[in-house]
Structures are given as structure tokens and as C-alpha cells.
């Protein structure tokens, strides 16, 4: 195959996509497990505390505060500047962030279930 600009362009695009896919596939099963754990926690919280109706506002306030504090920690300059692959505190923050994403998604889906 000749090395035209078009073939070089597509070769570079495919190499970039391959490197991105391999980068995201690291610990993929653990990430999915943490997302599902967050989804399960959201379902449990909505079911248990939603039965009485008295605790809804308090639990929602605690969850929003927890999500905001975690987001502040996750995206602060301290952690962004020293993203090291083997830093235990950063890896645990990433894991908790995946649980947080699952929690938000679970509450979002539960709100749609209640609305229909």
C-alpha cells in the first residue's frame, strides 16, 4: 500500500483509537462492578428511606453533600497535579467516584420509575 496522506491519516486515526480503547480497558470489570454497586446503593436508599416518606429530604441532602464533597476532592488542584497511577489515595478516589456515578444514575432512573 502506498503511503499517501489519506492512508497515513486513517492509520494515525486507527492507532489513536486503539490506544484510547486499550487505555480505557484497564480495570474495566472493576469499574463496571463499582458502577453497579452505586446503582444498587441508590435503589436500596430509595426503597428503604422512601417507604416512610419522612427521611426523604434528609437523605437527599446528605447524598447531595456527599457528592459535592467528593467532587471537590476529586477535581481539586492537589489531586489533578499529582495524578500518579499507583497512588493509593487517588485510586480509591477514582473507585469512590465510580460508585458516585452509579449512585447518581440509580437515583435518576428511580426518579423516572416514580414519575411513570
Swiss-Prot record:
Keywords: Chloroplast, Plastid. One of its GO terms (cellular component) is chloroplast. Disulfide bonds: none annotated. It is found in: Plastid, Chloroplast. Its main location: plastid. InterPro entries: Uncharacterised_Ycf20. PANTHER family: PTHR33787, YCF20-LIKE PROTEIN (PTHR33787:SF4). Belongs to the ycf20 family. This is Uncharacterized protein ycf20. It comes from Mesostigma viride (Green alga).
Amino acid at each position: 500500500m502506498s503511503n499517501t496522506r489519506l492512508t497515513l491519516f486513517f492509520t494515525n486515526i486507527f492507532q489513536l483509537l486503539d490506544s484510547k480503547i486499550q487505555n480505557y480497558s484497564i480495570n474495566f470489570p472493576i469499574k463496571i462492578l463499582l458502577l453497579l454497586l452505586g446503582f444498587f446503593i441508590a435503589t436500596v436508599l430509595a426503597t428503604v428511606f422512601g417507604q416512610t416518606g419522612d427521611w426523604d429530604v434528609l437523605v437527599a441532602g446528605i447524598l447531595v453533600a456527599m457528592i459535592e464533597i467528593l467532587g471537590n476532592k476529586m477535581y481539586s488542584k492537589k489531586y489533578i497535579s499529582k495524578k500518579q497511577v499507583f497512588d493509593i489515595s487517588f485510586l480509591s478516589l477514582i473507585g469512590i467516584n465510580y460508585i458516585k456515578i452509579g449512585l447518581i444514575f440509580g437515583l435518576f432512573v428511580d426518579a423516572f420509575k416514580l414519575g411513570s
